[in-house]
Amino acid sequence: MSQLQTLRGMVDLLPEQTRRWQAVESVAREHFRCAGLDEIRTPLLEFTDLFARGIGEGTDVVGKEMYTFLDRGDRSCTLRPEGTASVVRAALQHGLLSQGAQRLWYGGPMFRYERPQAGRQRQFHQIGVEFLGASSPRSDAEVIALAWDLLTDLGIQGLNLEINSLGTPDDRQRFRSELVQWLEERVEQLDAESQARLTTNPLRILDSKDKGTQQLLNDAPTLLKALSKESVDRFEQVCALLTALQIPYQLNPRLVRGLDYYGHTAFEITSDQLGAQATVCGGGRYDGLIQQLGGPVTPAIGWALGMERLLLVISAAAQADPDGAAARLTATPSPLVYVINRGEQAEPQALSLARQWRGAGLAVELDGSSASFGKQFKRADRSGAPWAVVLGDEEASAGQVRLKPLRGEGEEKQLTWEDALSYLMKQR
């Protein structure tokens, strides 16, 4: 019988990795709490029409990458490929927008059928932020600052913010016509994928990874030059606010996002921590999406970061700076106390002691092997705990434990349970 394995692009998170994820999520939660954001959780499975209407049928995500199937009711369903459309659907369905502007965050798995590679799987995880009902340039700057500060606190070095304006729908339509005309005159110089996009989603050609196409685009028209005065003024306000916040940025007139709902501010944050520039966060403004999904005209802006890519960057940062914030996030936590126990009386008492001390807030690991004291001491040392509590039948009869330091200097103490607990509470 063949060994059961995960599907390609689906990855198990083992305990060591899960601890790192939890550490990152904990930092993110605290940032969001301080910024007044509320968490929202949406289903993994949605009607396909949500993403076809929201993301855009001409996008690679909808056209090539979604996990879509007919359920037993003959309804087309899709595993969510991103979080924004689902958050907007939930806000509309439950009337959140009638309560005023919403500052929301989400986290969880997404699914796209694409080639698996380091930091990019078919089931991947995102943490995202959505400000619904936020119209001012200040909101753009605040959202970007929230991402920048979170990544900085995670200990990531070499951050680079690239920003662009995609303008209004009229701006983009005007630019699209100019770009298509320019590219059609040079269509034979485009790579095959870009040639296909010329008729379906020409703005995505600006994001081509083909080196020949990239070189050709150096002379192409840019969207920034096609913006209306109002769009230019708005973008300049966003840039001025970022400067005031001392967040460095670079203008990237080729920056477009892969989803059709973006307009005005678009941005990506990359890091050179992996050697090459790797995108760790991306987002932008999507003022037309809520109306497109059946709601009122509502401005909105948000971002998402990919956890798999982020954890690769954090691991690289930890190696580069063993004393930095990233290293602390990736460190394996150790118990404060390792309980070594053996004997007919001692073993049930050890279980009771561990339970009591855990209830007091101590991290206590209990050896449940009944192995020799020598073998248990070796396991205690490997656990990383600074203290071992030894409980044999002799100690059990006396209502005491032996408290032995496992790290550094110190003498073994024989104490009652209560005195040992009081002593350890002071050592935390």
Curated annotation (Swiss-Prot):
It comes from the Bacteria. One of its GO terms (molecular function) is ATP binding. Pfam families: HGTP_anticodon (PF03129), tRNA-synt_His (PF13393). InterPro entries: aa-tRNA-synth_II, aa-tRNA-synth_II/BPL/LPL, Anticodon-bd, Anticodon-bd_dom_sf, His-tRNA-ligase, HisRS-like_core, HisRS/HisZ, HisRS_anticodon. Its EC number is 6.1.1.21. It is found in: Cytoplasm. Keywords: Aminoacyl-tRNA synthetase, ATP-binding, Cytoplasm, Ligase, Nucleotide-binding, Protein biosynthesis. The keyword ATP-binding applies. The keyword ATP-binding applies. SUPFAM superfamilies: Class II aaRS ABD-related, Class II aaRS and biotin synthetases. It is an enzyme of class 6 (ligase). HAMAP family: His_tRNA_synth. Homodimer. Belongs to the class-II aminoacyl-tRNA synthetase family. This is Histidine--tRNA ligase. It comes from Synechococcus sp. (strain CC9311).
